[in-house]
Amino acid sequence: MRTSSLLTLALVFVACEQEYDIINEPVDVDPADVTECDFTQVESSDFFAYDCNPVFQGTGEAWSGDIGSIGFHTTQVSGHPFYQMWYTAEATSGAAYELGYAISPDGTTWDTHPANPFMRATPGAWDQDAMDAIQVLWDEDESLYVMTYQGYTLPTSDFDPGQWGIGIATSDDGIRWGKHPANPVIDFNDPSLSLTISPCWPLTITKRAGSYISYVGASVPPDPFFGGEPRCDVYTAVGNGLASWSFASNPALTAGDWYDAAGILAADIVEFDGQFYMFYIGFESWTPTGNGGVITATSPHVAMATSPDGSFWTKWPGNPLPLSGEISPSPSAIGAEVVGSRVHLWVNDYYDSIQENAVGYFLFDPNREEA
């Protein structure tokens, strides 16, 4: 089975080139001072929901349909936060997917790039059917954006395993991307890998002490006689560059509570107030898709874990997190960015009010007082 801010900031796209200065000075702006709507505390917690969610939905771009996976990054432009979003969407061109790019001065109002889309599915490629679970890292050492994603070609029968793996794409401007020639850099069908670990999908990527660290949902191989469904725990893989990865032998975070009984579907990690925070989406169970033994994650919930060093994690006792006000929530992707004294969160979820997937905006702000 396989698993599938105070200054009005004008940011102008010109000929696909960057027209801004990046600085490294910290900034601390209360988002409620610069956004159209306020934030409301969620159930006496340290989380606050934007009152005008969702902030990003079907963009109306001619090329795109429903929003799929999302990735975020924040930099400083003239002392103020500048938000970047990358997103995959169903393509009206007939391609399985295409990649779009949008920017925002406040995290809520987004301008899509006029030259979207920038990457699309290539027929016959190993990743022709999907580009899911995207995460974007800005590598300061190399002055390079690094994107990880799950790609696959779906099986055509019960005897066809399809092709599954983790792909890498890089960009020097966040707009023009090139896929790594060694893709998939982690091949889920690699027999030597499947003896010890069975990857589910990529979760997020960081860089510490000069090494890339990828967090991957993975399980132990199923029993050869009795089979069974995988449980996608969180494992780390250290990269020797971007093409060669070595997995840890033990999980960094183990699923298995009721809200993540079957595993972790998506995650993002930030360093905040002296420790690491993982914001993740766990799920309760699997559902067969009827397509060549492929199963899909169902009954998802947003949760959180902490770690002193990013190696091993402790789940938040208040899990799951109440970061959805919808009747039938179905969170599928999450992005986290530290700006000043708070963590900004974006969650891709199903919104009953518009009957489609869209991105909601939240704050994790332990020092904020509700008026």
Question: What is each of the regions a protein language model found here?
Answer:
Residues 1-9:
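Sec-dependent signal peptide recognition
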Residues 13-15:
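C-terminal motif of bacterial Sec signal peptides marking the signal peptidase cleavage site
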Residues 17-19:
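Bacterial signal peptide processing site
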Residues 22-371:
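Carbohydrate-active catalytic/glycan-binding domains of CAZyme proteins
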